[in-house]
Amino acid sequence: MYNFVKIFRSNFIDINAANKLEIFLKTILRIYKTPARTHLLAHAADISAIYAVREIYNYMKNDEEGRIILKEKPLLIRQDIQFNELKKLPKNTLGYKYMEFLETYKLHAHDREVSHFFTDLNYSYILTRYRQIHDIGHVVYNLNISIESEAALKVIELVQTKLPITALAILIAPLMTPLYRFQYIFKDSIPSNFLTPNFDYTYNDAYNYVDELSIKQYEYNLTDYFHVDKRDDQKFYSKMYQYYLDNINNSSAVRGSIIYGFENKSNNDIIYDHPNREYIFLKNLKKKHLLFQYKPRKNLLRELYPWAYMAGVSTTKPLHSIHIEKWLDKDIDLFRRTYNISPLPDHLNLMAGIN
């Protein structure tokens, strides 16, 4: 409680309704152009959330656990949570999985924007808590941070919170989601001259692809959904990152990722989803590599949105009204069973799950 009172006082911005409307309109126009600037989304949520937050407050006020949360105002910040201790917990606990998610995607609970425009302490806390619990949602529903996974989580949050900004995100997300995505996965390391003019894009055993075709047969940008854990070549990474920044909003472009240090242990050579014609897995048993390709936008509309809606409806209690802090040292599967949380189905895991 004491920590949030200090945070509230230092972050409150006192402006009139006309100024709020101006900020809302400006942020909405800029969100589509620069979706990576999450503070814009936060400001728009602040200004548009009053009625939804009031309903959340009334729900929590009439719920025993909710009343405790409103009274104590716990926060997922270092003053309240010993994050390093969470990494020492058993691997299937909620706290360990939470830290694993944050470190995998280079995130931190402190990155979540504090509510700025509510004059009411409780309302400000509720919206701030909703943002902090967002990453817990990723963990318990097993969703990564791709555009389509974020959009699916927004469906769950819309069901649980009725926040207008979640509906806006759901409507815009398909336009921002790439039409096609693939991943080339290397066995040991990315070739040092990859993405340079002298790189041989035709098949070459030295580069350990699974794909026997020329990479030049694809028109693509290496953007949006990349994951590089071992960056031996800093020039490669900076070039990859620049591609990401330049093309983040190019929804019609084909996007891909390069991963290495991966070993495909599946026994199947080819898996093809005939009903949806969505994706295909090609594996080379000798080299143990994988080429994975699918259509994110189609997948979002046909599979992720329907699953997310049902997952949101079936969950017996909104995440923001659960005392998450008391569950961090508990088994994540027990948490899911307790609140009837349905994580991402297995067949969607490679496309949208935490890997």
Swiss-Prot record:
Catalytic activity: a 4-hydroxy-3-methoxy-5-(all-trans-polyprenyl)benzoate + H(+) = a 2-methoxy-6-(all-trans-polyprenyl)phenol + CO2
GO biological process assignments: ubiquinone biosynthetic process
Enzyme class: lyase
Cofactors named for this entry: Zn(2+)
Metal-binding as UniProt keyword: yes
Entry annotated with the keyword RNA-binding: no
UniProt keyword list: Lyase, Membrane, Metal-binding, Mitochondrion, Mitochondrion inner membrane, Ubiquinone biosynthesis, Zinc
Family according to the record: Belongs to the COQ4 family.
Function: Lyase that catalyzes the C1-decarboxylation of 4-hydroxy-3-methoxy-5-(all-trans-polyprenyl)benzoic acid into 2-methoxy-6-(all-trans-polyprenyl)phenol during ubiquinone biosynthesis.
Note: This protein may be expected to contain an N-terminal transit peptide but none has been predicted.
Protein's name in the database: Ubiquinone biosynthesis protein COQ4 homolog, mitochondrial
UniProt source species: Plasmodium knowlesi (strain H)
Lineage of the organism: Eukaryota, Sar, Alveolata, Apicomplexa, Aconoidasida
